[in-house]
Structure formats: structure tokens, C-alpha cells
Amino acid sequence: MKQSKWTLLWLALLPCCVWSQDQIPQTAQADQLQTSVDSLRRYGHLADPVALTDFPVPANFRHVQENVISDPDNALAPFWQKLAESQTHAISDSVRIVHVGDSHVRGHVFPLTAGDVLHQSFQSLSYVDDGINGATSLTFTTPQRVAEIVEMRPDMLILSFGTNESHGKGYNESRHYVQMSDLYQLLRESLPDVPILLTTPPGSYERGGTRRRRSYTINPRTKLAVSNILKFASEHQLAVWNLYEIFGGADRACLNWTGAGLMRPDHVHYLPEGYALQGQWLSQAIIKAFNAYVESD
């Protein structure tokens, strides 16, 4: 890949891209913006669209789909509204995204890249991540974990799970659905009005062979977990960013990533360049959705 400012970004983040668990980031303090007494709604204009940056994929990528957030029920509208008003200082609060998930989030490069891109367009926006190695949605289904999320004061909550649920051969779709439901209900008790964006896992392999001669095959359960996440999103009127399908789906996602040399030797985790690309595309999808909201006003 050609060196760019994004390559420099993940190089700077590389020391923190480790798999060991450390303390959950402390709650960030809200930034203060210039206060405006008038809402832009009063003048019939919300905010201007934001310029989009093109983030090209490696040449070997095939079957890449349109990079969009699916939100047929406009579940994210309250977040777009607040973000638009913060753009013109119609409100004095900062806007915060909290990204919760497994080791893909825990490695920091994925969420920090997304946050860096977004902050360049939205000066009021802060992006906080909370990832745990080996996590599933069940990992966060405790009063303590939810309380920690609440303390971060999210205006939008991103949930990124599915890799670990689907990694074992004992994957059960019904159990996975119940675990998603349990976490969702617990979050809704404490954060009833916070919009939630689900993401799907990027894809992984499962290991076979012997200790001397390892072999890897595409994990066939990833597509089942993805379908389950999409079903849950539809039945609970939640927005979803389908990372798996966007980068090639069952036919090409894993082949695209490995073909570009962007996966680690374990064939589950990604190199910093791979996570950086995922973060860039997540931020691009968020900006597209924001632009669609303000342009429809």
C-alpha cells in the first residue's frame, strides 16, 4: 500500500495494538463549544454536507459493495440531529461516539482511525472505544460493564461483536440471538434514547492440520452470525453497518483480506493496515449517512 497519512497513523498507533488486556479507558470529559441561542431549525437549514474522502481498497479486492449504513427506520436520526447542530454551534455540548466490542476494537487501530477521520470533519466529536479480547455480547451483559458504558455518556453506541460467537464449532444461532437480546435490554434500561449501530464481523478462518503443518479454512459460521445480527437489527429497528458484506461477503471477504496480506498469521486478527482500512470505511459510511440526513432536511 502506498504510504499516506493513514499509514503514518497506524504506525503511530502500533505500540498500542497488542492483544493483552489493560484498563478500560477513563471517562472522557465533555468538550465545550461556543453556545448559540438559536437553533438552525428556526432558519430552515440544519447544516452543510461534509466532504467525503475516498479510501481505495487493495487491487486484489473483489465484490466490494456500496459502503453504506442500513437504517430503514431512521434509528440514528437523533444522533445526526445533534451532530448537525453541533456543527454550527447551535448547541454547546460535544458529541460522543462510544464503540464497544471484541479484540478488533481492543486493538485500537480500527476505532481510533474512524475517530480521527471523523474528527477532521466534526470538531465537536469525540470517539471512545472499549474493547475486550475474546469478548462476545455476553461479556458486556453485566451491570458493571453497562455502568461503565453509561459513564462514557454516548450520543451513539456502536456494538461490534460476532467473531468470537462464531469461532467455535458449537455455534448456536438461537443462543447467539438471546445473548444479543440480553445485552440490548440491559443497555436500553440505562440508555433508553441512545441510538445504537451494529456492525458485522470482518471474517476469519479456522485452524486445522497438525502442529507441524497448519492449514486454514474460511470459517463457515461467520455468515450465520452475520445473518443473525442482521435479523436482530431488523426486528429491533436498529441500524447496521455490514462490514462483512461490504468487503466481499461469504464469497470474497476472507479471500480479499488474506490476498492483500492484511491478516495476521492466526487468520483471525488483522494487521494495523487492515484495521485502518476498516476504520476509514466506517467513518466514510457515517459521513455518508450524516450527509443524507442534512440534505433531506
Report the location of each language-model feature.
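Alpha/beta-hydrolase-fold catalytic nucleophile elbow
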Residues: S160, T199-T200
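Proline-centered loop/turn at the N-terminus of a beta-strand
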Residues: V194-L197, A239
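Conserved SGNH/GDSL esterase-like catalytic core that processes O-acyl groups on lipids
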Residues: S94-V194, Y205
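Ser/Thr-glycine-rich phosphate-binding loops at phosphate-binding pockets of nucleotides
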Residues: S103-H104, T200, L271
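Catalytic His-Asp segment of secreted/periplasmic serine-dependent ester chemistry enzymes
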Residues: G203-D297
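Extracytoplasmic/secreted proteins, especially bacterial periplasmic and envelope-associated proteins
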Residues: N74, P78, V109, T113, ...
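N-terminal secretory targeting modules
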Residues: M1-V100, H104-S124, M152-R153, N291-D297
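Alpha-helical scaffolding within the catalytic cores
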Residues: D71-S86, L138-E151, V178-L186, K223-S227, ...
